[in-house]
C-alpha cells in the first residue's frame, strides 16, 4: 500500500547518553600522549590557585610542593593558593568540561579581539581552560583524593573519586588555605612514587618557567628555574646565549631575541642551530610556553618555512593550547604570532648583514644550501641574499651584484642582450671551464645544485630591468665559442672523421683556438644522464613505470650529445686532419679525444676503451 504523503512521521526526542566511567577512562588514558602529563596538569591547577590568591593578597607569594610516598604508592601535589569551598568542589571538580579558571576567562571576555590586552582577554595569568586536567590523573591513578580549604573560608572539604562514577564529598581536617591532590597510583605506575629524578624531570619539562617555586619532597632547593634570561625585561645577550646552549644542549651560531607587545605578546629567543638540516622538508621546532607553562618543546609552523635551522623557546601568552595541551590551536592569534616572528627574523638578519657581516657570512656559509633552496620561493629572502649570498664562479665567490657587473654584453656581437651570464651545472666540468674563463672578464657561475640555477635566474630577473641572457657554458650556446673560447668559425668535421669517432657518440667540430690544448671536450649533462638510465635499463634495474616516464621526458626534450672541438691551430691535430683516418696520427688523436672527454667527466663506453687499446698497438707498430 503506498504511503500517504499527508501522514505525519512519528518522532521523539532522546537525550545524549554518556558512559561516565568510559569517558573518565578515555580522559585518563587516550587524550594525552605521555604518562607524565598529569604532572603538568596538576601543577597548572596549583599555579592558577596561587595566582588567584595573589590577586587578593598583595603580600602573598605562594609555593607548590610535590611529595612522593613509595610505601603508600602515592604522589601528592600541594599548594597554598586560594583553595576550594565545599560548593566549588561539588560543582566543578567532578564536572567534565567546566573548570573555575575556564569560567573566569570566559567572564573576562566572550568576544575575540586580537587587539585586546591579554589580562582582559584571557583572565590574566591563569593557565587552565578546559576543566579536564584533573581527570588526566586517572592516567596514573585509580583513585584521587582532593583536600582543600578556601582562602578566608571556614570549613575544609575532602573530595574522593575512583575510576567509577561515584564521588564522595566530606569534611577535611586541613587548617590552612590551599589544596592537596593525592594520586593513589596504579601498580604499573608505582615508579612515580619512588623515582625522584623522574618526577623532577617532569617538573622541569613543563614548569621550569612558572613564577612560583616548586619543591620536591620538601627539599630546600626548588626544582624549577622560574626566571630564564630570555624572559627578563631587558635580556643580557651573553646570559641568553649561555642559557640557550644549556637548555638545548648545543652552541648557537647566533641568537635572535624576540620581544613583541602588539598585536600579540611574544617573549623569548630563537637561535641558529649548528645542526645542518638534511633536506628542505624538515620543519623548525620551537619550545613554547603559555603563561610560563611549557606546552611542548616541538611546536611546528611558528617560524618561516625557509628557516628549518632555527630552534628556540618562546612565551606566547595569547595563544590557545589544544585540549590536550600538547600543541597550539591554529587560529587568528597563531597566524598573527607567526607573522610577527617572521618580521623579527627578517629584521634581525638584515641588521646582521649591515652591522655584523662576518657573523652573517658564517651563518650563510653553514646553512648555504638551505638558504639558497628556500629563497627560490621567498621574495623577501631573495632580497636579503641578493647582496650577500656568494655563488661559486670561475672568478671566485661572487654575489649576484658582482656577477652582473662583470657580465656586460659585448655590443659588437650581442644585439639583444645587455648582459650575458654564463653558468655551468656540472661539477665534473668546473675546473675545466675555469681554465677557459680565466682569460675572460666574464665569470662562469657554477650552479652545481639544481636550485642554484633557478635562484640565479630569479635574482637576475629582480636585480635589473635590462635584458639579461642566462646561457649554459657550452659550445652550443650563442657566442660561447667566439667570446669565451676565442675560436674562429667552428665547422662540422667531415663524415670520415665522424665515422672514426663514432664509438664516442659525440658531436665533432673543427675550429682554430688560441688554446694550447689539441682537443677541447664539453660534457652534456643531460646526455650523460640518459646514458646512466640506459645502463640501468639494460641491467633490468629500472622499473617499467619509471622507464616510461624517462622515455617520454627525453622524447619531448632530446638529450643531445657531448661536444668535441679539434683545435686546428695545434700542429698534431692539423697534421692528423691532413693525413686522414688511416694514418697512425688518427690513433693518437683519438687517444687525445678520449683523454679530453675523461677529464671533462664523460662516461667512456667499453667499445671506445677497446679501440684505445688498438690505437696504442697501432702507434707502437708505426714506431
What positions do the PLM features span?
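GHKL (Bergerat-fold) ATPase N-terminal catalytic module, capturing the glycine-rich phosphate-binding loop
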Residues: 1-194, 617, 621
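GHKL/Bergerat-fold ATPase module in large chromosome/replication-associated machines
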Residues: 126-129, 147-166, 186-190, 195-623
